[in-house]
């Protein structure tokens, strides 16, 4: 695992790279809750439900990607990340008056983002982390549909999932992802949840999350009955919004609550496209490859994941 960079030019985003003192974050302005992933496992829904709680203020936009920093030439990674923007930029997205301040960036759990856990431990060492997981094959298919819809995947599902180092299999290695964070954070500050619990046992699951972050666990809102989907076609919508300068519309208008939900719903409407067929031999091949990951997650959580092996 790489160590977190502490040079002022990284932390402050200085163009000239001149040495200076690392800025002190504003008291209470940094997050103490981070939903780290996994992608296509329900992080948008969880982010929305958390933001409904009166003691919790989640970031807008949802995915700040602050701890991600990658050069454009990195194999398997698109250019992006906001590590270069500095702590003050990051802190500006959180309400200092909120008891719990959080964000949700599924890119944090990507195993290729080796610097993320140590960077987080250096900036928000007391943060509590939440990771959502789902059946790895279902997650791969959902991720594949998302990338196809955004115009970034031209190969069929079998070719894409057999491609060495592909994002679909890589981001389904949950045990590897969890262990990376446990190298920088104690076990009691990582909560791992199944998407099916959020889907079918939402009240109990949200009460558990609320207890984990230290707020009133009896809170419930009728708006939690909704499932907040990420759209398979959201990539194109987001790109269009950025070209039009509308990507931070919710934040600029100061929208919250019901208005915020409806505006985000309009630009996140799910695609009607059907899931691609998974060849049986490919499914067996992938599950065999992921067996150590499934077993590792069982050891970490105490779950019985027999249903994931078929």
Where are these regions (language model features)?
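PAPS-dependent sulfotransferase catalytic core
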Residues: 1-108, 123, 127, 137, ...
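The conserved 3'-phosphoadenosine-5'-phosphosulfate
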Residues: 2, 62, 179-284, 288, ...
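Generic structural signal for small/hydrophobic residues in well-ordered secondary structure
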Residues: 42-43, 90, 102, 120, ...
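Short catalytic/ligand-binding loop motif for oxyanion handling, primarily in non-cytosolic enzymes
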Residues: 44-45, 66-67, 109-113, 137-142, ...
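Surface-exposed cleft-lining segments at the edges of enzyme active sites
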Residues: 74-76, 103-108, 158-169, 196, ...
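Acidic-and-aromatic substrate-binding clefts and catalytic sites of carbohydrate-active enzymes
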Residues: 79-84, 108-114, 169, 197-201
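Alpha-helical packing segments of well-folded alpha/beta enzyme cores
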Residues: 86, 90-93, 116, 174-178, ...
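PAPS-dependent sulfotransferase catalytic domain
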Residues: 118-119, 126-132, 138-204, 208
């Amino acid at each position: 695992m790489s160590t977190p960079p502490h040079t002022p030019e990284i932390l402050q985003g200085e163009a000239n790279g001149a040495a200076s003192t690392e800025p002190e974050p504003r008291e209470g302005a940094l997050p103490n809750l981070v939903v780290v992933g996994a992608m296509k496992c329900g992080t948008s829904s969880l982010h929305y439900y958390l933001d409904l709680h009166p003691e919790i203020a989640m970031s807008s936009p949802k995915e700040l990607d602050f701890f991600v920093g990658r050069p454009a030439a990195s194999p398997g990674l698109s250019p992006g990340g906001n590590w270069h923007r500095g702590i003050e930029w990051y802190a500006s997205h959180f309400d200092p008056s909120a008891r719990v301040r959080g964000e949700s960036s599924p890119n944090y759990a990507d195993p290729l983002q080796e610097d993320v856990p140590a960077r987080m431990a250096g900036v928000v060492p007391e943060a509590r982390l939440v990771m959502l997981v789902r059946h790895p094959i279902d997650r791969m298919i959902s991720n594949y549909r998302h990338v196809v819809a955004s115009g970034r995947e031209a190969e069929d599902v079998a070719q894409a999932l057999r491609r060495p180092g592909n994002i679909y299999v890589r981001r389904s290695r949950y045990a590897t992802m969890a262990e990376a964070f446990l190298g920088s954070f104690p076990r009691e500050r990582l909560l791992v949840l199944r998407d099916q619990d959020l889907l079918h046992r939402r009240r109990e699951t949200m009460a558990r999350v609320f207890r984990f972050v230290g707020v009133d666990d009896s809170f419930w809102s009728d708006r939690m009955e909704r499932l907040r989907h990420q759209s398979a076609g959201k990539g194109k919508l987001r790109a269009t919004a950025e070209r039009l300068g509308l990507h931070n519309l919710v934040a600029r208008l100061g929208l919250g609550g019901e208005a915020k939900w409806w505006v985000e719903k309009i630009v996140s409407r799910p695609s009607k496209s059907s899931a691609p067929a998974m060849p049986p031999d490919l499914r067996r091949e992938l599950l065999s490859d992921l067996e150590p990951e499934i077993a590792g997650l069982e050891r970490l959580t105490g779950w019985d994941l027999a249903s994931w092996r078929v």
